[in-house]
Amino acid sequence: MNKKILNFIKKKNKTKIISLTAYSKNIASIIDRHCDLVLVGDSLGSVLYSFSSTKKVTLDMMIEHSKSVRMGVKKSLMVVDMPHNTYRNSKEALSNAKKIISKTKCDAIKLEGGKKVIQIIKTLIKNKIPVMGHLGVLPQSATNFKFKGKEIAERKIILRDSKLLEDAGVFSIVLECVESSLAKEITKTVKVPTIGIGASVHCDGQVLVTDDLIGLNKIKARFVKRYSNIEKQINDAALKFKKDVIRSKFPTKKHSY
């Protein structure tokens, strides 16, 4: 395990871990100043391409966006999602993970699931590919996005899977839409950092989709807090530009050759 990953793990129980998503160099270079982890999430499918789910996201999409993000990330740990149907077995997962790592120079990959993907995770880690786990709501296979952990049987499975992921060697676990007390229990139980998204304040850190954070997405999930309204700022700038062009106030001599 490399030094960057080890330093990330050491943050558990010491300081809250900050994570946001990025799909381009420009956004990555801004959030890198404030993040411990920058995630190139397959959420880019819905955020950038208006896909109804992440299932349509391809490996090539992830690689190209990650290459752009890599140019903007200098400080943070950079993690890339393995998209749907790219890790159906150990052989496929290893081939695609190697491709992601070699072409994007990212620090680690993330994949979804518990018991079903344990052998795949072990294979990747055996081949020195750092893996981040993901439990709770799993967008690549979810039929609904209701929070997880309300029922006792479901709680037991998620808790079991968190221990299995830790034993398999993941360096961190994302908990998505997990009931508060369960997220707290998992965070206390496992020795690796938990990163919550809709999983309460009890996790070791938090992650949000940056476009949600800055107010670019129309749909707002319960777990999202908007810290800015970039949509309004873009709208205002475009309107001012339009008015200047119509009134022949742009370009001026200052902006001409």
From Swiss-Prot:
EC assignment: 2.1.2.11
Family matches, as Pfam families: Pantoate_transf
Record's keyword terms, sorted: Cytoplasm, Magnesium, Metal-binding, Pantothenate biosynthesis, Transferase
Residues involved in Mg(2+) binding: D42, D81, E112
Residues annotated to bind 3-methyl-2-oxobutanoate: D42, S43, D81, K110
Pathway given in the UniProt record: Cofactor biosynthesis; (R)-pantothenate biosynthesis; (R)-pantoate from 3-methyl-2-oxobutanoate: step 1/2
Catalytic activities: 3-methyl-2-oxobutanoate + (6R)-5,10-methylene-5,6,7,8-tetrahydrofolate + H2O = 2-dehydropantoate + (6S)-5,6,7,8-tetrahydrofolate
Superkingdom field: Bacteria
Compartments in which it is found: Cytoplasm
Recorded family membership: Belongs to the PanB family.
Function according to Swiss-Prot or TrEMBL: Catalyzes the reversible reaction in which hydroxymethyl group from 5,10-methylenetetrahydrofolate is transferred onto alpha-ketoisovalerate to form ketopantoate.
Protein's recorded name: 3-methyl-2-oxobutanoate hydroxymethyltransferase
